[in-house]
């Protein structure tokens, strides 16, 4: 098995943490796993023997994309991987096409979400075509949630028999043992800012598609009712799909908002939240939702692809209609006024995450999938 190479692809090195622990787990199982991405510090953490740099741009750039495709074809021709597992949209497209052209036996497209869900017109057509080509070139598809699998099928992107969901879903699961409830100490400056208020939390990219406008509007409703609350937002403000200026000013200037651009370890921040609001418009799965639940924080999310897989409505959190900030505010108020409900939902969420979304489950299922392919190749 050692001589059969397995290539994992992502577009940019910043996406390598999506596979945190997975590469190491598979290599310990004597699998010759390599990583391909654009250059970056995350890729440099791996030995040159298994780390391959192929420059790729996240946005559509025809000339640059063709150059990336050619370099990928040359890499596959030289290294001859038996399995190519391509994740993230651009690497998914370039990787599956290159693997198809070079006739790599197993071509997996790991779908972590569909950007086309929140766009219209010509851009929708382009993104749909990209997904259609990638899924056609793939021999197998991994969807990171059951609802994402359903969306792929109903969008006529691929047939059901081509799609697998590992375990109960998620991008990579979570390493549950790291999510300790007693890890709640914040730097003094953050502790003073939160000041023992009821904390409404959010972790993720600060873009329209994540429902930031609804997060802000629901928070305004709660404040208008006289509750002593703080909004803790952890994430980076991005230029693509950027939020409205009024929302930007609210996040950066309102004294009841604590905005933190980036933290390497959000666990202590989760442990200082009373409720986690995840009003996303689309997801592949939504790992931040299960991270919050792992630390007994009730989650309020929306009824969209990916997010609905993370919460059992009324048991580990609440699911509301996409865009309905009044419903979000209603659920927040319910949780503010019922400490017993918060505790019950929190306990239920942690138990469910431990039982269903451990990284070990995802890794073992992926290992089993690879072993099946490798054993089939030995019999030929």
Swiss-Prot record:
The keyword Isomerase does not apply. Required for the biosynthesis of type 1 capsular polysaccharide. Keywords: Capsule biogenesis/degradation, Exopolysaccharide synthesis, Glycosyltransferase, Transferase. GO terms for molecular function: glycosyltransferase activity. One of its GO terms (biological process) is capsule polysaccharide biosynthetic process. Gene3D superfamilies: Glycogen Phosphorylase B. Coiled coil: none annotated. Pfam families: Glyco_trans_4_2, Glycos_transf_1. Its EC number is 2.4.-.-. It comes from Staphylococcus aureus. This is Capsular polysaccharide biosynthesis glycosyltransferase CapM. Pathway: Capsule biogenesis; capsule polysaccharide biosynthesis. Belongs to the glycosyltransferase group 1 family. Glycosyltransferase 4 subfamily. It comes from the Bacteria.
């Amino acid at each position: 098995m050692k001589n059969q190479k397995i290539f994992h692809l992502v577009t940019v090195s910043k996406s390598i943490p999506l596979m945190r622990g997975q590469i190491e787990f598979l290599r310990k199982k004597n699998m010759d796993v390599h990583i391909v991405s654009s250059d970056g510090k995350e890729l440099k953490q791996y030995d040159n023997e298994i780390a391959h740099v192929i420059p790729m741009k996240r946005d559509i750039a025809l000339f640059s994309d063709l150059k990336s495709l050619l370099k990928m074809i040359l890499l596959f021709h030289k290294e001859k991987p038996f399995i190519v597992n391509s994740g993230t949209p651009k690497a998914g497209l370039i990787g599956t096409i290159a693997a198809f052209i070079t006739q790599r036996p197993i071509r997996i497209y790991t779908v972590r979400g569909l950007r086309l869900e929140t766009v219209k017109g010509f851009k929708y057509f382009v993104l749909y075509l990209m997904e259609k080509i990638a899924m056609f070139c793939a021999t197998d598809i991994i969807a990171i949630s059951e609802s994402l699998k359903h969306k792929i099928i109903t969008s006529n992107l691929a047939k059901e028999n081509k799609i697998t969901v590992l375990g109960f879903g998620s991008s990579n699961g979570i390493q549950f043992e790291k999510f300790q409830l007693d890890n709640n100490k914040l730097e003094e400056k953050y502790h003073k800012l939160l000041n023992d208020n009821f904390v409404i939390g959010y972790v993720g990219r600060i873009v329209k598609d994540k429902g930031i406008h609804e997060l802000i509007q629901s928070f305004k409703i709660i404040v208008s009712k006289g509750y002593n609350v703080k909004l803790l937002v952890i994430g980076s403000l991005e230029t693509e799909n950027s939020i409205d200026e009024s929302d930007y000013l609210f996040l950066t200037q309102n004294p009841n908002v604590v905005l933190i651009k980036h933290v390497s370890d959000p666990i202590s921040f989760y442990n200082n939240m009373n409720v986690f609001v995840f009003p996303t418009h689309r997801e592949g799965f939504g790992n931040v939702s299960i991270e919050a639940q792992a630390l007994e924080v009730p989650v309020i999310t929306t009824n969209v692809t990916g997010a609905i897989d993370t919460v059992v409505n009324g048991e580990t959190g609440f699911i509301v209609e996409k865009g309905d900030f009044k419903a979000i505010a209603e659920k927040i108020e319910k949780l503010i006024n019922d400490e017993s409900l918060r505790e019950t939902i929190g306990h239920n969420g942690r138990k469910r995450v431990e039982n269903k979304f451990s990284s070990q489950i995802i890794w073992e299922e992926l290992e089993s999938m690879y072993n099946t392919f490798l054993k089939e190749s030995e019999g030929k």
